[in-house]
Each structure stands twice: as C-alpha cells, then as structure tokens.
Amino acid sequence: MLAPTDTKERLVIIGNGMAPGRMLEHLFDKEDAGFDVTIFNAEPRVNYNRLMLSPVLSGEKTYADIITHDDAWYSQHGVTLHKGAKVTDIDRDAKTVTSDTGITAPYDRLVIATGSNPFIIPLPGHDLRGVMVYRDLDDVDQMIAESAKPNAKAVVIGGGLLGLEAAAGLKMQGMDVTVLHLMPTLMERQLDEASGHLLEQALIDRDIKIMTQASTDHIAGDSKVEKVVLKDGT
C-alpha cells in the first residue's frame, strides 16, 4: 500500500523529458514510493520519446505514436503535471518553485532535469524568422508547417547525425534540401573517410544536395531568412 499522503515527501521535478520519465518509472516500481510528485513541463504536453522526433518530422509517425506517459499514467500514479509551465524562480529558503503561469509548489526534494538548449551558430542573421533549431516537438511542428508551403526549400547547416536526420525528414516532406557541412566528409566523428563518402552518395541518391567544406558566412534576408551565404561567396 502507498504511504498516507501526509507522510509523503514532496518531490518537485522541473522538466519532463526522458530522464525524469525513467526516474519516475523506477520510483513507482517500488511498492511504497513515498513521494507526492509534482512536475513542471515548459512544453504544453505529456512525456514523449525525443529520439523518435525524426520519424515524426518525416511523417512516418505522429506525436501520439511517441508518447511514453499519457495523462492517464500521471493520474494513475497520483502525479500532478503542470503543462506549459516554465519554472522562473526557485526559493531555496522557502523551498518553493514558481512558474511563469503563477503556480507555486513547495518541495522537500527538488530535481532539475531541464536538459540542454540547442546551439545556434552566432552568425549574422541567425535571429531571422525562419531560422530554426531541432530539439523538441514544437520545432518539428514548425518545420512541417514550413514544408507545406509551395516550393519550400531548406538549408541544413551541419552534416552530423541530427542534421542529416533533419535533412532526410524535410526531404520526405517534399522540401528541396541542401546540407552544408564544414568538414570534407559527413559525420566525420563517427565515420571514416570512405564511409562518409558512401553516406554522401546515398543522400545524393535521395535528391538531397550536399556541400562539404562549406563555411557559412552569414544568413541573409530582410525580416525572414532568404538565403545562406558561404565565405567563398556561394
């Protein structure tokens, strides 16, 4: 049996990615978890598998397909989930956290599991509308919306694993895709030169344009991105 509510420690978790999801699974494997759990999720949704974002981008899966813990799961385990609530203040003396939606929750134990932020190359024009990152479902939804526009084109800066997954997904959505990569071969940290060339050819066969040894100078456009200019003037 679960311990009475008044004897449970108040556990507050900031972030609702894969790590806190697995932590809760292990916690609830015990017969007596002993915690009253509250989660603040900056995203307006339940827990999902971020590793499966690429199939969502390509159209092979939907958000519903990659949910790991649905609303019923949180309810079943007595977890309070605040969706779309970004924590903006932690009061360590009062042992409370407060969100941008005005919710304040007390805690006995606090877990901060917000994950990482995507790196945006600090190039001139990086803040133009239409310059996107690839980290969460909102980013994927934005890219899919752009791909639906007539004659949509995409430039992916970076020929690592994530960049190539994004390029492949955008191509499957019907976009004209070009990958710009600084090094001589793709995925040079994981593949040797011969394998990198084989991968490049496989992507070219999918009608994805590849430009290696491409050093980006700036992103051009008035209010919205229009093109990417390389240091050699291309």
Name each model-derived stretch.
Residues 20, 50, 67, 120, ...:
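A general structural signal for well-ordered alpha-helical segments in protein cores
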Residues 36, 75, 81-98, 105, ...:
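A Rossmann-like FAD-binding core segment of flavoenzymes
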Residues 142-191, 225:
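Rossmann-like NAD(P)H-binding beta-loop-alpha module
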Residues 45-46, 117-120, 224:
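Active-site/binding-pocket entry motifs
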Residues 2-80, 167-194:
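Beta1-alpha1 glycine-rich phosphate/pyrophosphate-binding loop at the start
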